[in-house]
Curated annotation (Swiss-Prot):
PROSITE patterns, alphabetized: DAP_EPIMERASE
Name of the gene encoding the protein in the UniProt record: dapF
Domain of life, source organism: Bacteria
Binding-site residues, substrate: 13, 46, 67, 77-78, 160, 193, 211-212, 221-222
Main location: cytoplasm
Site (Important for dimerization): 272
CC annotations in GO: cytosol
Similarity section: Belongs to the diaminopimelate epimerase family.
Catalytic activity: (2S,6S)-2,6-diaminopimelate = meso-2,6-diaminopimelate
Name by which UniProt lists this protein: Diaminopimelate epimerase
Species this protein is from: Thioalkalivibrio sulfidiphilus (strain HL-EbGR7)
Amino-acid biosynthesis as UniProt keyword: yes
Keywords: Amino-acid biosynthesis, Cytoplasm, Isomerase, Lysine biosynthesis
Amino acid sequence: MRIQFSKMHGLGNDFVVIDAIHQPVDLSPDQVRLLAHRRFGVGCDQVLLVERPSDPAAADFRYRIFNADGNEVEQCGNGARCFAVFVRERGLTAKDHIPVETAAGIIHLQVQPDGQVTVDMGPPRLKPWQIPFEAESAMTSYPLEVEGETYEIGAVSMGNPHAVLRVDNVQTAPVARLGPLIEAHPRFPRHVNVGFMQVVSPGEIRLRVYERGVGETLACGTGACAAVVSGRIQGLLDETVAVDLPGGRLVINWAGQEEAPVMMTGPATQVFTGSIDI
């Protein structure tokens, strides 16, 4: 079948975005992997589908996310910003405020006058069973043994699971070595995204993220949210934090209460449109 798509990115975290409302789309894991392949397909970190919501009274669209390995996942913050720009540029909505259904629940997208997008990611989930993470009780950080060494990590779900490891220098952090080991750690039964966070000041961090099913990406929106939440509950960060990722900067705001939503603001860019037979 021939599929129309847009290639987009949020700070270099790139996506193939597909309108599945006005064209029939039913992707197998093999087809997702082909679309995501950077030599034989279009090339991307994730494939995003725009679908009709299951409950039109609660949301305007359904947002589905597939990693480059073909697996469907619950949430992607950078993708959410691209989703908002896509549905506006394609004329699917004229709204500035867009409620969207995801596998992790309803999120709210707000297109700002300058074109940036603020995403209400909802409240973080901090209890181990919500992440999911094997631990007896909720803590601000947890010891995690990896190949005989013990690391102190934060564990947060932003609709998808995240481990956050504080490092002295993000540039020299062992992302390629530790990332896949923590991602597949048995205490994370559904695997986990791994953030390496350097605290510059209470209002600024530097972050690299090893995404499950993808590897290291230039930016990760939910990873930025999780890092700020983890740093804030440990008393390291302010309510509003600039997060510098390899692909650029996001601004994250979280009041600090467990029930308070995490707000993420950043850009989204369309690179090109096209079609592909798969």
